Regions:
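Flavin (primarily FAD) cofactor-binding/catalytic cores of flavoenzymes
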Residues: 1-61, 65-85, 89-91, 105-195
């Protein structure tokens, strides 16, 4: 029997299938942060972040999606990335990007990679022009970040890109380029420990 708040149900078997994405990985930095530290698994919607100063840490899908959503209501939103990433639009020619990509597998890999780089450069320009770091790897050499809105929000001043965190001090964060900014919340979208 399993007891819920309002009722009880009986089952023959109980299967717990929570996978390996359940133990948040939160990097450590020098100093202490007096604001609120959160992990992306705690993010449900953007209402909690209304009128707050928020730093999102990470460069993957969750980090970028959360930064965009938070920036719609927050007083200030920044995103801290420790390296450069390639950003793949969610849709290409009206198709989900993975579906579009699967339709190009007949093209020899070297030509396909060249065309992908050319198309992204043509559509997005240089990542450095957004204040982001240049990726040190080819497209799809690592897990790509699928997001169609981050670059738009950066260019329109809704999200400020930052380098990796160097240290915390009270409510301020010092970044590796020496810049310092104050935040109410630091939200880590830095993945999970595999357990």
């Amino acid at each position: 029997k399993i007891y819920f708040d309002e009722f009880c149900e009986e089952f023959d078997y109980l299967i717990i299938a929570n996978g390996h994405h359940w133990s948040p990985r939160i990097p450590t930095f020098e100093g202490d942060f007096n604001g609120e530290l959160m992990h992306s698994h705690q993010f449900k919607n953007n209402e909690y972040f209304k009128d707050k100063s928020v730093l999102v840490v990470g460069g993957g899908n969750s980090a970028c999606d959360i930064a965009v959503e938070v920036s719609r209501v927050a007083k200030k939103t920044s995103i801290s990335m420790r390296r450069g990433y390639h950003f793949i639009p969610k849709f290409i020619m009206g198709m989900p990007s993975d579906v579009f990509y699967s339709k190009t597998l007949w093209i020899p890999q070297k030509i396909r990679l060249f065309l992908q780089k050319l198309a992204l450069r043509f559509i997005q320009g240089k990542y450095e022009d957004y204040g982001l770091q240049k990726p040190d790897h080819d497209i799809l050499q690592t897990h790509a970040t699928i997001n169609s809105e981050l670059l738009y929000f950066i260019k329109h001043g809704k999200i400020k890109p930052q380098k990796n965190i160097r240290k915390f001090s009270n409510n301020s964060v010092e970044f590796e380029d020496g810049s310092i900014d104050n935040f109410d919340i630091v939200l880590f979208a830095t993945g999970y420990k595999i357990k």
